Amino acid sequence: MSLVSVHNEWDPLEEVIVGTAVGARVPTADRSVFAVEYAGDYESQEQIPSGAYPDRVLKETEEELHVLAAELTKLGVTVRRPGPRDHSALIKTPDWETDGFHDYCPRDGLLSVGQTIIETPMALRSRFLESLAYKDLLLEYFASGSRWLSAPKPRLTDDSYAPQAPAGERLTDEEPVFDAANVLRFGTDLLYLVSDSGNELGAKWLQSAVGDTYTVHPCRKLYASTHVDSTIVPLRPGLVLTNPSRVNDENMPDFLRSWENITCPELVDIGFTGDKPHCSVWIGMNLLVVRPDLAVVDRRQTALIRLLEKHGMNVLPLQLTHSRTLGGGFHCATLDVRRTARETYQF
């Protein structure tokens, strides 16, 4: 039986990968890091501070990830974790060289769709070999009958990036490039965010990979920067949480217009360590749905918790203290590998 089986973002969770903060660092400043992550924060890539995150940040985050894993285990979920890796090691191709980033966000580089798991062609050079952290798991899933695909490795030359372009146009269409976290699963409908972490060719490649069973919906002018899971959050069939600073009547994906849309309330700014945060305050709506009536939510976001409870959701309140520093909340820091239902939904 395939150990990979996921059709959407809400069916009861059976197996999940929880990331690790061990060894996390800001990679060497290069054109990819500047264009994708920091073009709006610094005038040149030379200004970007790189190197290891403070030990305190990593220690506290790893402890909180352990708590998350333990709580999910109590709920009967099988939890898998990557082992430690040396992210300071050099990564080199004929076109460039850099060092690594982290394995904190398995959501960013692996996409599970049905019984298929896909290694996506990520936008940052520092994440070029990130899937190696999960190689043993991928082999195990493959042995169980899962379909294992790896997108063509992008060259990620300087031509792939336009750091001086407006936000949303800094990743060019030289070749298919996208992070898995640019995708949300709604049964046979896949929402694909066209942004600085996912280009048009990436959407075209994904459609060819998943075949005619699925429809990839490229969403443009929804959110310019990286990843979609703090912009639109599916809670259960027919109910979606949206970011009021990004989603409006004009850019709401057509296939979601019939859904009940609840607007995320103002969030608590949890702060960050260092000169610049890696993500905005909206990381507070980056939640993990465990089943249609239960979600893991940042305990500090009390207004959001009350809103979810009002709409019939129970909440498991946990905390990732440094989510703005490291760039990921509970959805980012996990990858759902298997959910109970075998039914696919088409809306």
UniProtKB/Swiss-Prot annotation:
It comes from the Bacteria. Catalyzes two non-consecutive transamidination reactions. It converts scyllo-inosamine 4-phosphate into N-amidino-scyllo-inosamine 4-phosphate and N1-amidinostreptamine 6-phosphate into streptidine 6-phosphate. Keywords: Antibiotic biosynthesis, Streptomycin biosynthesis, Transferase. GO terms for biological process: creatine biosynthetic process; streptomycin biosynthetic process. Changing G329R: In strain: ISP 5236. The keyword Metal-binding does not apply. It catalyses: 1-amino-1-deoxy-scyllo-inositol 4-phosphate + L-arginine = 1-guanidino-1-deoxy-scyllo-inositol 4-phosphate + L-ornithine. This is Inosamine-phosphate amidinotransferase 1. Signal peptide: none annotated. GO terms for molecular function: glycine amidinotransferase activity; scyllo-inosamine-4-phosphate amidinotransferase activity. SUPFAM superfamilies: Pentein. Homodimer. Its EC number is 2.1.4.2. It comes from Streptomyces griseus. It is an enzyme of class 2 (transferase).
